[in-house]
Amino acid sequence: MLTKKIRKLPLALRAKIFPEGRNYVPSLKTPVSNFLVHTKRHCNGGRTVDAGLWLKKHCDKGGKIFFAMAGAGSSFEIGVSLSEMIRAGKIGAISVTGANLEESLYRYLSNKDYAYIPHYDELTRQEEKTFDRVGLRRITTTFLPEEETVRKVLNHFLKLWREAEKTGKYLLWHEYFFELFRRKLVKPGRPEDVKNCWLYQAWLHNIPIFVPGVEDSTMGNIFGYFSYDGVHPFLKKYKQKNPISVNVIGHSFRYMHRLAEWYMDNTKKKGLAFLELGGGISGDFPICVVPHLKKDYLDGHSIKIQEK
């Protein structure tokens, strides 16, 4: 009966409706996928599984994923899975916040020094103050070893920034992190941390990275301090005698230019899958470059040409 009613619809509307069930053949090699396809059929769960099945087909055909990550994914060891995706050739490019970028490096340096507190939501105010007094820094369930990470690499960054200042050249934010690996200035805390550091794997496999909003990170804050050259009556008392030039960092418009070029060079033959974890600028930035290409560079051209 339902099929007869559907046939009465206009073709365009009929094309939006699918019979229940998926064209999926279970495999002994994919027990998790088998379970999800069998149990998650409707609403958000069903849409998520459908997206995953589409993404697998896309990658099986040689397509790449543009991976955008917000929040504290690197602090929570997203590198374990993202690094594997990079090595498998699934990732085309990555857009991340400044905090996610540096946290991947910190996991590389001192993963063994992180600590876990599962019931953080039950902490009292006094307990939180006690953590702060002894120097513990926490993001929800995870304590971050600042002394073993940030302070360990700070002098390397200061030297790189001063070096760029002398030569009159700039690097994009992530390229300074890549320099640490290229020059072998840092070593992993443990051998297995190399495998699980997505930043290191991205450098190793020449994966382009885009970092909008680099200021929102610990090292970004530190650079803001060392480059401050203002005259505020309070802040000027604490500024450096010789502030680092802000021009040693390629600002976000440089990232925008590079991403526009990357899109043009990497979407000619095959489509690009967009996978976003979390909200905010890490996902908004790579998305906004698409209409930027259409409406700014191709302003005045037909919609057909813009879409092409």
Regions found by a protein language model. Give the residues of each.
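Metallocofactor- and cofactor-centric catalytic cores in central/energy metabolism, strongly enriched
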Residues: 2-153, 159-163, 167-170, 181-277, ...
